[in-house]
Amino acid sequence: VDTGVVSGKLRIDSWDDGQDPVFHDEKRGRFITNMGFANFVTAAVDSDDERIKGSCMVILEEDDPGLYDRGTPTQKLVHQLSSTRDPAFNLKIPADRIIGGYTVKDGVIIPNYSHAEIIESVFRRTRVPVGIMSSAKLLSAPEPIIRYHRQRFRGGASTSPGTPRYDLGLQQKEDCLQRLVDIWAAGEAGSALGFLSARLFDDFDVIEKENERIFAEQGIKGRAQLKVFRKVQVDALEYLKMKTRPVAEQDAARLQELENDTLVQFLITDSLANVFCPAGKLWNTGHGATILREAVSLMGGYGITEDCPGFLGQKWMDAQLEATYEGPEAV
């Protein structure tokens, strides 16, 4: 997804009169998931040709002329079911592989979207399910823990059916119960936050498309959109202040007008998405991994075995990687 950190260069290989240009793409990837069997990839590239402006995302296919090297497998300790590699590409591709298309002005190819614009749009959505992944692991933990705790002392000569030691096992200990509740609550809270974010983006998708349509009709692009939103921000703040007032004090007509204003609703929903997406990703994966360690500890020695009930040890290790999915925590 980077253009400068890992090499990603795009130049024109040929451009005949009346024909679309053919590009020469050079790209090396790092820690690319599913690369072992992917027959196409999307790559971020920077212009290495004065006839191409800025950066863009392009589609590279296995059958394109040139080098499509999947690279060596990454020696991961976790998430073993996904193939991760460091690929290398040196390919010729048609110009229509630019994601989002392009225009030509004064002999210069201008991509409609930079690589950063596309990546931002993708990541702010894909970070949501990453957070839910960790929360799902937490929600799967209480059942095997309860089963282990209640069966812990069964089979012993001093433990007979019907006694608290037989029926409850380790759950006679208050500490075990409190820790278990913490694990369950963290899973429920993380899931609630994750699904709230998912529903928010469902609503945002509709508003975002309408927002893009309005700007396209008016021919407003780039920084000109920022100028428009500076004015819209005043209306958005007015809407938020009005929503906090008692119904009797609200101007119903004005409130309805602002609720029907696509740009106002876009600005508000976009602001919410900018908070809930990173918050869910950071808290669900970071705090989730910490709480999963608690789950492992409640399994005793079983917690670090390959056949641990619920595979909690493996899930805890997997959670360490999820904290870096779609950008590390520092990002």
Task: Name each model-derived stretch.
Residues 18-70:
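A short core secondary-structure module
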Residues 87-126, 146-171:
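A glycine-rich, basic-preceded beta-loop-alpha segment at the flavin cofactor/substrate interface
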Residues 188-281:
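C-terminal helix-coil-helix/basic helical segment that borders enzyme active sites and/or dimer interfaces
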Residues 262-266, 304-331:
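Glycine-rich phosphate/cofactor-binding loops in nucleotide/flavin-utilizing enzymes
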Residues 273-302:
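Charged, glycine-rich active-site and insertion segments that engage polyanionic ligands
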